[in-house]
Amino acid sequence: MNDTSDNQSKNADELILSQDIKLIGVDDPKSKDQVFNSAIAALEEQKYDISYELFNYFVESFEDEEKNPLSHFWLGEISLIENDLSKSKDHFMELISSYPNHYRVPLAHKKIGDIYLKSNDVQRAKDKYNFVIREYPNNSASSLALQLLKNME
């Protein structure tokens, strides 16, 4: 019975320590940059599972007006690569709704069109691509959407 109590105490101590470490990192720009840069490095090495975990940790642990939206973008992209379309759409929608003026928003809309296309929802894909062209005519995402529409004809 004493072993059970010791194990519970040890687990509680580990949980508290884990939370303390996480909280220390919240206000530490060096930790923030280290996590984000490690996520990018893993992404570049196509270690998608590691990259996903790091980006996810980043958005759950840090506030950063530039890197949080990028993290959501990359979480959406990794999910799309791994064909988890629902999770991918959720991340792109989070970027769009939480950071509507971020420079990745037009591409996030285009990626949602890609998700519809991969789901064989051709009409919704076309509608989304037309939205990108109409709302962001001077963005490179618009050119990509236009090309995809031409390829669908």
Feature-to-residue mapping (PLM):
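Acidic, polar-rich low-complexity tracts and alpha-helical solenoid repeat scaffolds
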Residues: 1-153
